[in-house]
Amino acid sequence: MSSDPNFSLISFLECLNEIEHEFLRDKGENYPVLVRKLRELQQKIPNDIANLPRDPETIQQIHQTTHRIRAVAQAFIRFDQKFVSLCSEVVHGTSKVMQEFNVVSPDVGCRNLSEDLPAYHMRKHFLLTLDNPYPTQEEKETLVRLTNESTARVGQSSVNRPPLEVHQLTLWFINARRRSGWSHILKKFAREDRSRMKHLVRAKLSSSNQSTPPSSTSDSLSNNLDDVLSDNLGRPLTPVDKQQFEDDWASMISWIKYGVKEKVGDWVYDLCAASKKTPKPGMPRPVTTVAKRHPARKTKPAAKPKSRTANPRASTTPSIDSTLDSSKLESTPELSMCSTADTSFSTFGSSLSMSHYNPFQDGNDILQSPTVKARGNRKVKALPKRAGKQQPDEVDNGKIPFLCLSVAFV
């Protein structure tokens, strides 16, 4: 460093006073000139300044002058930072006011955010607060009101969509952070630290020449995207890391802008809507399960085997060997078909004497003839032989019991 041999503390104080007056008088246009003068003054200071003659009063004035220059410089730096922060707040506030009046701002318009989506206002708020997409309670209530008003105005209420509520909006933001990839970037490139994520998003927006959300504190960290990524990863940034971050960022922005509906096309939703049948009022909505997709083949239930035990029908028709007492009538399967034999058989019994009737007196004529003539010119059909009851007096006398014929009127 070259030094001036004629340098003294008095000349040094005079140079500082001149720089101080110019610094206070200038409006910012000559700041580079002042910086150049300070560098030249630094070069004139000899290395052996400690060996110069010391004047306590001059040294005190030099300290006071340098302190004033430092204070003014720091004040100007803070003013500049505050000015930038206020500009960002004005832009953000203007965008919020325009959002409430449903006016698309130029910044959002250039992002091609789809206004046809039901979650338009929520996605729009997500884009404006990428560094911290956690809306406050007041912002949630505003978004719910705007979404319900826009849905009713556009005519989407025709699909019987219920009004949005605050807890549903909270769940939407939770799912949006996860499904868009914001949480993935937070975990992979920001160490799951929301303050690091906020700085990373600001650096990315600055590198893309986009407006950054206002910051409540002065950010003294670097805004270089590569430096921020390298610091968050804890190692030097590689081209692969940079490409992965760019891909994840592009995927996140695409999901926030367009969602899923516009990617697959409206014809898919039209086809699904046409295939659905309108349920009857009052009927529960059918739920498709694995068992219902492939129903089992319907089979007829196994028929119960019929009982072979015949139920005997009580018949009031008396047999030929019974008495005329109706309380001792015999019920047989062969006589179940003779429903009109009561009157006819009583007439037949009155004309024939049971004690004198011998079915074998005419030989085999009665057996060979299928019918016999009864009283009143009615024909009766002979039924197969059946063993009759033996009379007690006949058994005692040694007589052979005779067979009775059951008859049925044709």
UniProtKB/Swiss-Prot annotation:
Pfam family, one: Homeobox_KN
Compartment list: Nucleus
Residue span of region Not essential for B1 function: 333-410
Motif segment (Nuclear localization signal): 276-308
Residue ranges, annotated region (Disordered): 202-239, 278-335, 374-395
UniProt feature, compositional bias: Basic residues: 291-307, 375-388
InterPro entries, alphabetized: HD (IPR001356), Homeodomain-like_sf (IPR009057), KN_HD (IPR008422), Ustilago_mating (IPR008888)
DNA-binding region (UniProt annotation): 107-184
Keyword Nucleus annotated: yes
Keyword annotations of the record: DNA-binding, Homeobox, Nucleus
Biased composition (Polar residues): 312-335
Gene3D superfamilies: Homeodomain-like
One Gene Ontology MF term: DNA binding
Region described as Highly conserved between B alleles: 111-410
Region annotation (Variable domain between B alleles) ranges: 1-110
Signal peptide segment: none
Family: Belongs to the TALE/M-ATYP homeobox family.
Name the record gives this protein: Mating-type locus allele B1 protein
Organism: Mycosarcoma maydis
Native organism taxonomy: Eukaryota, Fungi, Dikarya, Basidiomycota, Ustilaginomycotina
